[in-house]
């Protein structure tokens, strides 16, 4: 199989990279009616597979799970989760031939094997859905021409997909139709109905392309979503301990601080996150972020270049073929870092303290979000896609670190995200180590010694304007506004 993106000419590549629009609520007035009465079979019963299935069943759809015969015979976790929740479970051979819609919610690395296994079993004119387009775009999977190929990708972990649905809402969702596989021209209608059944239309749906989703998703997860957070944790912990901060306190300040700081980011963007700092701390965080961007910009550009060219996918798939030798070694090395093995602390840390003593963390998040967003847009990815794959998802990943540090993050994210995270981290740590070592203890762990909030007014105005007047802040305010409006509409219905 050849890389699908690289098989297109430049005009086709740019057209698909730039495909993304926020869909109007009126486009979902028929809900999931288009696929009611269909036999819908889910492959995979992990967090996304189970929780999407629960939502779709509650929306009135007919859901069953196809598992490998050995998983059923041995009553593995996937079988237990599906049966405990009252779903019909069968083998591929039993369920796939009757399926109108097959949802491939297995891990990325398994997609080629899974699709090649189920495709001969699928009936004429059936539909195959992905939640991530890597198999189509990077591996170049060619699906039978009579099969419609769509993508429905909730931009949140599976557990949140379920919890938001139970609250009467949903999570932002990206949908797409593979242009090579839309034989009846109804792929978009199927994707819309599927997204509605999971609750996605209540939070906002982006109509995108397989290519835009893959290239932006890979870039976001490698850089700001995982790589920058891991780099911040490893270097930040080293710095604080070297400065004499008690190890348990240092680990907690980072582990819980990343989540607390990014919650402010989630609610009101970079502007709100920076506004949580005192005036002197805000100016310092702004200056640090600019310095960090200067150091890291070439690394962000290299990751984007390797993602666009397919070089990243080529090297990762070579590691797949080598039984994940690099991935497993890097995972083990990460688990041996000082931050991962730091003692826990029961010391209470006030919410504001995470900002006051975490100026460096704020600067890293600001620099990472802006670099990831701007680098994606410069590569031809539309702003809406770039926002959802940078700022929007950062708090979700920080939440995993808050639970069980970097181990939890790397367990929850996809195999492609974990591999890319390690690549970025291995380059970023040496780039930033001297910078972090040389910075004042006031910026991480200590807090500013001067309690005065006094600053030069002209400089503060300049900094505030620079923070607010960026493309990621403009599009973020617009998209968060859409989500709030839709939540109000959902609550009123």
Curated annotation (Swiss-Prot):
Positions that bind Mg(2+) 1: 217, 221
Top-level taxon of origin: Bacteria
GO biological processes: isoleucine biosynthetic process; L-valine biosynthetic process
Keywords: Amino-acid biosynthesis, Branched-chain amino acid biosynthesis, Magnesium, Metal-binding, NADP, Oxidoreductase, Repeat
Binding site residues for substrate: 414
Cofactor(s) named in the record: Mg(2+)
SUPFAM superfamilies: 6-phosphogluconate dehydrogenase C-terminal domain-like (SSF48179), NAD(P)-binding Rossmann-fold domains (SSF51735)
One GO MF term attached to the UniProt entry: ketol-acid reductoisomerase activity
Family indicated by similarity: Belongs to the ketol-acid reductoisomerase family.
NCBIfam families found in the cross-reference section: ilvC, PRK05225.1
Protein name: Ketol-acid reductoisomerase (NADP(+))
UniProt source species: Shewanella amazonensis (strain ATCC BAA-1098 / SB2B)
The organism's taxonomic lineage, starting at the top: Bacteria, Pseudomonadati, Pseudomonadota, Gammaproteobacteria, Alteromonadales
């Amino acid at each position: 199989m050849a890389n699908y993106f690289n098989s297109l000419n430049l005009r086709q590549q740019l057209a698909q990279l730039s495909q993304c629009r926020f869909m109007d609520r009126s486009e979902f007035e028929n809900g999931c009616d288009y696929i009611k009465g269909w036999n819908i079979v889910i492959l995979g019963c992990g967090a996304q597979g189970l929780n999407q299935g629960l939502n779709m069943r509650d929306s009135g759809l007919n859901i069953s799970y196809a598992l490998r015969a050995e998983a059923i015979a041995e009553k593995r976790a996937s079988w237990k989760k599906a049966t405990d929740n009252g779903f019909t479970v069968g083998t591929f051979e039993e369920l796939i031939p009757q399926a109108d819609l097959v949802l491939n919610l297995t891990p990325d690395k398994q997609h080629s094997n899974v699709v090649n296994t189920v495709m001969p079993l699928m009936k004429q004119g059936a539909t195959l859905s992905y939640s991530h387009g890597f198999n189509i775009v990077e591996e170049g999977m060619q699906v039978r021409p009579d099969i419609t190929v769509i993508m429905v990708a909730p931009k949140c972990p599976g557990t949140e997909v379920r919890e938001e649905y139970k609250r009467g809402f949903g999570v932002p969702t990206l949908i797409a139709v593979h242009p090579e596989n839309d034989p009846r021209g109804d792929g978009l209608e199927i994707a819309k109905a599927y997204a509605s059944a999971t609750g996605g239309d209540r939070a906002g749906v982006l109509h995108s392309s397989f290519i835009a989703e893959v290239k932006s998703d890979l870039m976001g997860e490698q850089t700001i979503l995982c790589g920058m957070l891991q780099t911040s944790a490893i270097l930040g912990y080293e710095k604080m301990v070297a400065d004499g901060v008690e190890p348990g306190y240092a680990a907690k300040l980072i582990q819980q601080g990343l989540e607390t700081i990014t919650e402010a980011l989630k609610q009101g963007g970079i502007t709100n996150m920076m506004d949580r700092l005192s005036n002197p701390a805000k100016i310092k965080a702004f200056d640090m972020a600019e310095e960090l961007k200067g150091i890291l910009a070439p690394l962000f550009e290299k990751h984007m270049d390797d993602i666009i060219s397919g070089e990243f996918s080529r090297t990762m798939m070579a590691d797949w073929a080598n039984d994940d030798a690099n991935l497993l070694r890097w995972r083990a090395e990460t688990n041996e870092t000082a931050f991962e093995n730091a003692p826990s602390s029961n010391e209470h840390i006030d919410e504001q303290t995470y900002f006051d003593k975490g100026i460096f963390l704020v600067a890293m998040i600001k620099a990472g979000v802006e670099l990831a967003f701007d680098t994606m847009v410069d590569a031809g990815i539309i702003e809406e896609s770039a926002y959802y794959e940078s700022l929007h998802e950062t708090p979700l990943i920080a939440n995993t670190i808050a639970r069980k540090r970097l181990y939890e993050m790397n367990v929850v994210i996809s195999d492609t995200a974990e591999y890319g995270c390690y690549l970025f981290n291995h380059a970023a740590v040496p780039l930033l180590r001297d910078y972090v070592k040389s910075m004042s203890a006031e910026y991480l762990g200590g807090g500013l010694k001067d309690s005065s909030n006094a600053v030069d007014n002209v400089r503060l105005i300049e900094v505030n304007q620079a923070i607010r007047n960026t493309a990621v802040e403009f599009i973020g305010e617009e998209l968060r506004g859409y989500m709030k409006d839709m939540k109000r509409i959902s609550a009123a219905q």
